[in-house]
Amino acid sequence: GITNMQEIKDDYYDGERPLYGIHDTKLINTTFGKGESPLKETANLALDGVLFTWKYPLWYSDQITVTDTIFEEMSRSGIWYTNDIEITNSTIQAPKEFRRCDGITLDNVHFSDAEETMWSCKNIKMHDVYANGDYLGMNSENIYVDHLDLVGNYVFDGAKNVEVHNSRLVSKDAFWNCENVTIYDSKISGEYLAWNTKNITFINCTIESDQGLCYVDHLTMKNCRTLRTDLAFELCSNIDAEIKGSIMSIKNPISGQIKVDHVDEIIMDDPKIDQSKIKIIQNDQG
């Protein structure tokens, strides 16, 4: 809670570990200059208008709220082994933020370099997040996303239990090696979507993916569009897909049903596949 919190205001710190281990403290309009690990091993902090300019600002910390704060480019690897952190209305210029954290809530946060960000974390909520960079969210789990605008490849590689709403992802190799993903009302553009993933569902989505949706087990699509998508569904099993409009080509799916308005080309040339287990229904063919 916020009761009995001491306050640090309009201050400046540099050097190594200047506020090591502080707790139950509000930091307002405070800048951390050159010096590693300024807030290591801290707990129950409320940061407002803080500027971090150097490495490892929040390691091994618990119960941190952050508002209107800037993590500059050199505040890299900034938030590791930290639990229950909430960041609102803030800008993160540094890569490699968040590693092995439990309990991350982001609201109106801009990552200008999201490379290797949020790896091996769990219990994540993101709302109104703008991110640019490769490998966001790798091997993380229990993720709820609403309005993520991402430009960056390999998003959520190896993630588990992911729910995405109202998002726009420009990402090749998105959702590889995942388990239990549901995506609603979103646009995804980028080749090789969701390979090697188990249990992925797309509802009201627009997908543009060269060789997308291959090697998936349990793929569900409801009211989706596949713009410029070819060689889809290769070696995909347990498909339940309902696609509006057309798809360029479908290649060697293993099992399930695909309903689509029109397919330009169906390629079934893999002798290992029992074609009686797959049904492709084209609405324009009655």
List each model region and its residues.
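Long, distal/terminal scaffolding or interaction modules
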Residues: 2-286
